[in-house]
Amino acid sequence: MAYSYTEKKRIRKNFGKLPHVMDVPYLLAIQLDSYRKFTQADLSANKREDVGLHAAFRSVFPIVSYSGNAALEYVSYSLGKAAFDVNECILRGVTYAVPLRVKVRLIIYDRESANKAIKDIKEQEVYMGEIPLMTDNGTFVINGTERVIVSQLHRSPGVFFDHDKGKTHSSGKLLYSARIIPYRGSWLDFEFDPKDLLYVRIDRRRKLPATILLRALNYSSQEMLSMFFETSSFTLGKDGQFSYEVVPSRLRGDVATFDIKDDKGNIIVEEGRRITARHIRQLEKAGVDQMEVPSEYLLGRSLAKDIVDTRTGELLFECNTEITSDVLSKIVAAGVEKVETLYTNELDCGPFISETLRIDPTRTQLEALVEIYRMMRPGEPPTKESAEALFQNLFFSQERYDLSAVGRMKFNRRLGRETETGEGTLSNDDIVDVMKTLISIRNGKGVVDDIDHLGNRRVRSVGEMAENQFRVGLVRVERAVKERLSMAESEGLMPQDLINAKPVAAAVKEFFGSSQLSQFMDQNNPLSEITHKRRVFALGPGGLTRERAGFEVRDVHPTHYGRVCPIETPEGPNIGLINSLATYARTNNYGFLESPYRKVIEGKVTDQIEYLSAINESEYVIAQASASLDDNGRLTEELVSVRHQNEFTLKAPTDVQYMDVSARQVVSVAASLIPFLEHDDANRALMGSNMQRQAVPTLRSQKPLVGTGMERNVAADSGVCVVAKRGGVIDSVDAGRIVVKVHDAEVEAGDAGVDIYNLIKYTRSNQNTCINQRPIVSMGDIVSRGDILADGPSVDMGELALGQNMRIAFMPWNGYNFEDSILVSERVVQEDRFTTIHIQELTCIARDTKLGSEEITADIPNVGESALSKLDESGIVYIGAEVGGGDILVGKVTPKGETQLTPEEKLLRAIFGEKASDVKDTSLRVPSGTKGTVIDVQVFTRDGLEKDQRSLEIEKAQLDEVRKDLNEEFRIVETATFERLRAALVGQIVASGKGVKKGEALTHDILDGLEKDQWFKLRMNEDALNEQIDRAEEQLAERRKILDERFEDKKRKLSTGDDLAPGVLKIVKVYLAIKRRIQPGDKMAGRHGNKGVISVIMPVEDMPYDENGETVDIVLNPLGVPSRMNVGQVLEMHLGMAAKGLGVKINKLIQEQKAVADIRSFLEEIYNSTGDVAAKEDLVSFSDREVIDLAKNLVDGVPMATPVFDGAKEHEIKALLRLASLSDTGQTTLFDGRTGDQFSRSVTVGYMYMLKLNHLVDDKMHARSTGSYSLVTQQPLGGKAQFGGQRFGEMEVWALEAYGAAYTLQEMLTVKSDDVAGRTKMYKNIVDGDHRMEPGMPESFNVLVKEIRSLGINIELEQED
């Protein structure tokens, strides 16, 4: 197999047994693909598909004026260039966006001509605001902060049938309902009430009988009945008896009210007997099609058609009239020969529409329309036109109603139609078909839908949501344009004068800036970034709300398999509403989640991969990824465990149609990073995957000894590392940049063939952690495309590294690890294992105030020399200064209001020019409790103001950096060009040239003796060579010109002033780097949900040690394992111990300078001979140099990968422990560090990967002496941010009361809280060294008195003197 640059340096021993079928797809694809579809920036205007921006414009344009004499048509759009790149936008606090220009065509028609002749056409490009661009990592920079737009899981448009589970009516009767949900437009609900009448609701308003809707669609009563019912025919004979046309199947289950006979008079069913299937067969056999029935047989039935008197032609009875004996006698008297009745029965053909018609008050279409108008717009007087227009706009107008392609597909599928495409609006057939389906479900035929099925929920990603917002903006523009279009013809306006882009820009800005789904990116570490971008929210606009979401929505559903992770979801009120995409899941064109499967043909597994959505999946039989196969890929077991119709069953291999592609297909990225996940309880795995996202990047990242093999994918896809765009040779590398000379094969014509990667150094992340990239390549290394060149935060050698491998013992230790506390050795602090760097950004803003402008200066009133010692002459702190709480970072003074001066003061001021008292000190100071180093300062000055010394220095430094970059690029291009020329010229004959004899053959020495520009003056005998020389000269000149232009562009950006908010003159941003060591109170965790707080840091000499004198780093409580059932941590420790032991052995081989062959054979034994190795590592292809490099990287331990659900088995761990010459029990004898005594029994010791979580005691600890008070209650504020106090609540008061501690209680409720006079007096007393207190009246009593007065009760406190 081919190893990448970093894999060669450090191979992970993989325990996976299952074959590798499919690489993990690019993890950010869901974000990037969605937004790429939205902008279609890389496609030319005529090739754009009807999605995204293009679709939004197409749906709103053309806009036609009210008179119809002018129209505005959309032609195409183009995206401009971004003013600043991503990093500049973050620095300046602006949005990373590009201008959108739309080409529109204004057509004016001739009023006079009959056939709308075109009078005038004007075409113009119109600016339509800015569209935010997505960065390469799937984020947006909005106002300088990185944000993520998370995808939303919402109910798919279409039609859904459901019932109320018997909760509405006390009888527990199931009331069925149908709901048509469009993508945009009014909802249409049909529902049964307890009396089995069918009602309709529009937009959840009050209900109307469903037949009103049908009548509004222009159906008559008779048409309605014929659509929903079959009829029974009765013919009146000469003898006054009725003859019934028999449909035998309809009689089943009825009780015969008379003898039923065949043609010969034989009785088939006796009176009073129930008619069974056997009777029906006999009737069919006897060919009975007519049957004499008594007239009572017709009573209670309903007429299917209007009954008309044949003689007079008058209407006797309307259809749907119930037949009574009175009605029947009139029908007979009128001489009606044939009566048709509705066929209904109790079981499977209820009379619902017929009953509903009886309560329907309307008779004509207009009445029905008026009724609907009254329901939608109560209180408005209806007219015929307004009623018709309202109804037409509800479901039948393309502007107001759209099912969308998805909705139409789901709608047609649910109603069992052949086609999946159709109109976006509803048709009469659609509405009738939905009612028919609902009635058939009520009749017991068919099933209701499961709304939690992932076939009924679809994912809306960034692109789609941005398109919707954009359309909302365009619709607002449309209204304004329509008004102005009528003026366009008379005043000769251009398209630019018609369109005001503000509403579009506002809608887009609002969505990206403040939508519930546009979130501040979680940038703790690379994993949290990736997880945030792969989030699926059920909340948000158009989704659920926390309060309404029940248990079912939150629960794991069988269709989540391979689509949504069943493990990773937050604990707390959002559980189950925020999910994470499974590793291999993707969305299809309709927005439904799909999962990949391998095709199985007649028991043989192929390598063909197909994606199935939840809609299709249930019909297939799908085997697990772990099903055993023989060498030919055939399923070997007699019965295979499969999933079929959302259930797990066993089937024969020949029945299997698909098979999972991987064992980690089920879980998300975070869960797939937990080794031995299969041995952990689900609740703990949930905590484990959530806590990995909170790990803070440590000073020196360390790869996990026990991983899962996913670490490399996460690091590469997260975007925090520098990944080679093209293969090549490392030309130069330092801490800040890597220069790659690209392989000739990958260089395109006219391209420099140089890739320069500038590394990010010590930048602040959204969570104030530190982002820093370190190169891992050396000069001269050969890299290929996709290799990792530099590690980012929490990445080690191209692998995700969130924590540190710690030597851990499971034992109680003096109660210091009671209840999940953690005992840590001082060595961990000394070695800076969990030291993290946090970067804080502090901002000082100088504004223009009413009293004059604020000034940033080092001249601050009443501040001593020492306080100003760290500021330069501009009043800004030096880079590198060590500052602590209260130190001045930026000196700033603000004008004070003019006070009335005494004559003496005026005189003094006139003499000495004393102005210091006019300003007050409002400098930026370091917040209390913070200590750090200034690592960067940025100064932004308003355009038009003169820049101070400091900003000019910063600007110069930045320009030098750019110049250095460009020179480097030119140097490499130049070198490469001359190398190619040298290769072509050596040995060729010169025709003429300075410093060279004619007819001489060129050698390396001659060329070295020439100045570089003299090479271009050479003329050779061959014309082809002369052409090559000229072309090289042109290319270099062209390159130099391009680089100079880039430099000028950068210079222009830096030297122009900044676009600051109104009233702001200058902004200074100071970045502090704060080093946080680990300390008691910090939260730590493993990857299995085993979290705890550090209780104490013990000296190394007191920690338990083994017989070699090796102390443990951390002591954990063994009681934390059994009840929590996360045994994965114990297995991880054992395997970690083996990994470390093997590293020690390799180190010994290197120290003893053993032959390379010995090292190679030991590595062969580790990788290819120990355990059940599925895929062997190809160490034979490694050179001796590479083997030594590999061995040196394995000294700290041989990294292992135990993939989820396919991990290391117990016997393999034991084999590795034996290979490392360790006890295969995984237990060790330990000695007490304080006494030297051996502990009474052996202890489990091993290596576990521990994380330091972003819940640091420094951020939480807080103390208050005096501070600010709440205005009304006069009690101290709460919380660290407000510098608040601790609340002494009701229950605490009870505790003091229980102890009878009256004086303490008095102190708590008065001087320490809201007794204003008492606390001031107390403070004075303490200053004077007198510790007495005089409690007075608490302010809360006064508040109570005032509140009672507000009720109109006067209450006065009478105090005794």
UniProtKB/Swiss-Prot annotation:
Going by the entry's taxonomy, the superkingdom of the source organism is recorded as Bacteria
Q: What class of enzyme is it?
A: transferase
Give the matching Gene3D superfamilies.
Answer: 2.40.50.100, 2.40.50.150, 3.90.1100.10, 6.10.140.1670, DNA-directed RNA polymerase, beta subunit, external 1 domain (2.30.150.10), DNA-directed RNA polymerase, subunit 2, domain 6 (2.40.270.10), RNA polymerase alpha subunit dimerisation domain (3.90.1800.10), RNA polymerase Rpb2, domain 2 (3.90.1110.10)
- Keyword Transferase part of the UniProt annotation: yes
What InterPro entries has UniProt attached to this entry? DNA-dir_RNA_pol_bsu_ext_1_sf, DNA-dir_RNA_pol_bsu_external_1, DNA-dir_RNA_pol_su2, DNA-dir_RNAP_su2_dom, DNA-dir_RNAP_su2_hyb_sf, RNA_pol_bsu_bac, RNA_pol_bsu_CS, RNA_pol_bsu_protrusion
Q: Name one GO biological process term.
A: DNA-templated transcription
Q: Keywords, A to Z?
A: DNA-directed RNA polymerase, Nucleotidyltransferase, Transcription, Transferase
Q: Which GO terms describe its molecular function?
A: DNA binding; DNA-directed RNA polymerase activity; ribonucleoside binding
What EC identifiers does the entry list? Answer: 2.7.7.6
Gene Ontology cellular component terms for the protein in this record: DNA-directed RNA polymerase complex
- Coiled-coil annotation reads none
Q: Which reaction does it catalyse?
A: RNA(n) + a ribonucleoside 5'-triphosphate = RNA(n+1) + diphosphate
So what does this one do? DNA-dependent RNA polymerase catalyzes the transcription of DNA into RNA using the four ribonucleoside triphosphates as substrates.
Q: Which HAMAP family match?
A: RNApol_bact_RpoB
Quaternary data: The RNAP catalytic core consists of 2 alpha, 1 beta, 1 beta' and 1 omega subunit. When a sigma factor is associated with the core the holoenzyme is formed, which can initiate transcription.
Q: Which family does the entry's similarity section mention?
A: Belongs to the RNA polymerase beta chain family.
Name assigned to this protein = DNA-directed RNA polymerase subunit beta
Q: What species was this sequence derived from?
A: Cellvibrio japonicus (strain Ueda107) (Pseudomonas fluorescens subsp. cellulosa)
